[in-house]
């Protein structure tokens, strides 16, 4: 079993992280090698508004022409990344912030010309991550990548799944503001892609949880073996280092 854990923290969660979250990262780091990937959607939207640039999304992906890509890069690689790095270090967790273009860490395949500079992970330079971890640092990755000489925006879920799959990670943890999937008010501790399809069809999973489980299912298809959906505002780690939340595994494939 791999000793890597990949943690994905969406942009909407970054301002909600408290001391409990950083304590959980400490506990994980005692047993595993931790990599963190973050988003930055709300900050990007705010900066685009300041610049009088239209915000447009298609099928959950940000339409990213050149002028939008410049803002995305500035926000993700600048203030958002460094704020998270500084918060980690404030809690005595040594971290190094970098983006997917540093050292060609995340190489991408463009999604389509219609949505501009948006790519999906095609290759991860894992040696860079392993080197930072072996020196005692937590890599904190901004989800942009490269294709040739061009820089591309990457959906943070796709970046996290690509990194987790490339590292053969034990687990990919999605940090959210809910405890996991709830069924009749009770936490669903374990589920698989077949049961999730049923949950969506019967209305057990609704609203904001749908994109979270869709991201988990996409991660399974990329080769990640185990995904946990946890509440980042609460203690989400057991004494054993296992996560408290909903664990999603592949189970029986959907026909």
Curated annotation (Swiss-Prot):
Its EC number is 2.7.2.8. InterPro entries: AceGlu_kinase-like_sf (IPR036393), AcgluKinase_fam (IPR004662), ArgB (IPR037528), Asp/Glu/Uridylate_kinase (IPR001048). GO terms for biological process: arginine biosynthetic process via ornithine; L-arginine biosynthetic process. GO terms for molecular function: acetylglutamate kinase activity; ATP binding. Keywords: Amino-acid biosynthesis, Arginine biosynthesis, ATP-binding, Cytoplasm, Kinase, Nucleotide-binding, Transferase. Pfam families: AA_kinase. GO terms for cellular component: cytoplasm. It is an enzyme of class 2 (transferase). Pathway: Amino-acid biosynthesis; L-arginine biosynthesis; N(2)-acetyl-L-ornithine from L-glutamate: step 2/4. Transmembrane segments: none annotated. Substrate binds at residues 40-41, 62, 153. It is found in: Cytoplasm. It catalyses: N-acetyl-L-glutamate + ATP = N-acetyl-L-glutamyl 5-phosphate + ADP. CDD domains: AAK_NAGK-like. SUPFAM superfamilies: Carbamate kinase-like. Its main location: cytoplasm. The record marks 8, 212 as: Transition state stabilizer. It comes from the Bacteria. Belongs to the acetylglutamate kinase family. ArgB subfamily. NCBIfam families: argB. Catalyzes the ATP-dependent phosphorylation of N-acetyl-L-glutamate. This is Acetylglutamate kinase. The gene is argB.
């Amino acid at each position: 079993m791999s000793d890597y854990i990949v943690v994905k923290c969406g942009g909407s969660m970054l301002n909600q992280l408290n001391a409990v979250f950083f304590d959980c990262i400490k506990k994980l780091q005692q047993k595993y090698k931790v990599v963190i990937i973050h988003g930055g959607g709300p900050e990007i939207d705010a900066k685009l508004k300041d610049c009088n640039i239209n915000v447009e999304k298609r099928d959950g992906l940000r339409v990213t022409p050149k002028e939008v890509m410049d803002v995305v890069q500035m926000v993700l690689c600048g203030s958002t990344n460094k704020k998270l790095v500084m918060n980690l270090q404030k809690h005595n967790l040594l971290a190094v912030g970098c983006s997917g273009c540093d050292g060609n860490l995340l190489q991408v395949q463009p999604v389509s010309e219609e949505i501009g500079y948006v790519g999906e992970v095609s290759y991860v330079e894992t040696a860079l991550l392993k080197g930072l971890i072996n020196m005692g640092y937590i890599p904190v990755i901004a989800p942009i990548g490269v294709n040739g000489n061009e820089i591309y925006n990457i959906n943070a879920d796709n970046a996290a799944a690509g990194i987790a799959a490339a590292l053969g990670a034990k687990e990919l943890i999605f940090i959210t503001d809910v405890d996991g999937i709830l069924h009749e008010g009770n936490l669903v501790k374990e589920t698989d892609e077949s049961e999730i399809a049923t949950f969506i069809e019967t209305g057990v999973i609704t609203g904001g949880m749908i994109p979270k489980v869709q991201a988990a299912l996409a991660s399974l298809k990329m080769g990640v073996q185990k995904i946990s959906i946890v509440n980042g505002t609460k203690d989400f780690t057991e004494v054993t280092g296992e996560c408290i939340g909903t664990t999603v595994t592949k189970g029986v494939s959907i026909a």
